[in-house]
């Protein structure tokens, strides 16, 4: 993936998800310095980090259909009963995105709107 494409994806996550740079790093289980190096082309994400980055971008896109950026950020960092009290951010950071994706599918179907 090119530097400009990677930067665009990270910017999209930050913009649509209302997520700060350090939170992007937290969600991807890396450091803010590493994310900065990805954005400037000084480094490339490992496959696992790239997969999480792409999933996080997809999630931010989906949440933007329902929420403003500040609301999406709140959704990501708040405990949810439908996730057994877990925060989506914690599940993303540990690679357990399947549960979140199922919840997003339910939101899209109108089950919890």
PLM region spans:
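Non-transmembrane "mature" sequence context
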Residues: 1-113
